[in-house]
Amino acid sequence: MKSTPYMRDLLLYSGQEDNYQVSSERIKKYLRVSADDSQIHRLCIYYGTLLEDELSSLENSVVEKTTELLEDLETEEVIYAMSDGCLLPTRPHQVETEQIGSWKEMKLGRIFREKDHLNLGEKPNLIRSSVYVSHFGKHHDFTSKLSSIIDPLVKLDERLVFINDGALWIANFIAAYYPNATDILDFYHASEYLHEFSKVIFSEKKEAAQKAQWVDKQTLRFFNDEIKEVIKEIEQLKLNGTTKIKAQEKILTYYKNNQLRMLYKSYKDRGLLIGSGPIESAHRFVLQKRMKQSGQKWTKKGGQAIANIRIFHLNNQWDNVVSLINKHTSNAA
């Protein structure tokens, strides 16, 4: 079916919202027009790839979205920058005589203002507006994209707040390019390490109460900026057996590498978030909702193309997609 630019607009929008078969059915139901799912697929890959190819020329408009975050920013207000990766299933590839599929990480960044993060009490918190960036590949390519939209915020110094899981690549990136920013280790990752370690050193059922007491003691230290005391106590544990010793080494390495990012009392005193819930939820509705459905497997090109279209939609920059459609019509499927 030949399609007008407006029809392609609708097909792309539908294709980034749900899988191609569902998109085709919706178009037929709403418009009484037949749109083959393979056509929607080809259009999404074509224009999503063009978005990646022309990202440098579109970069200024993405940067403008970040610059808008600075408008009407209150004197003490902060801007959060969070990033994390989620695993997506990829297409099997031939290795000798075996078909092998794998999971690859797509990285996602989310930037938002403090005032846009709304606490709704018993309901899940709401973030009214965010700027997103994604990359299906190596972390240095992702940080290149990420830095282009964070750079306008560098003048905020400590009011630019990063919250991450402690991955070395993101820690090094922040230290190198935004040394005056506030860098926080997601509290729930810090706590998870503590709980997993406690299961190893208090492995007997009869030690359950002792385990809970020990975890509570260390958690209280977290909220008193006493990470050094936590490290010291773990170091002084006399453990026997390979499993316990390896667990001790693992948690000590993690805490020592991140201790400057674990001053949770100081962060709470400033009224800052200490958890990475916003980026975890973004993974679900930005990427997984569309890209982790039953039976889906992605190529790097296809995965990045769909992510690009979704990102421009969720960044409220669909006009860029429409401009691209009007600019490139003859070669599309």
Give the residues covered by each predicted segment.
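Catalytic center-proximal scaffold of phosphoryl-transfer enzymes
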Residues: M1-A333
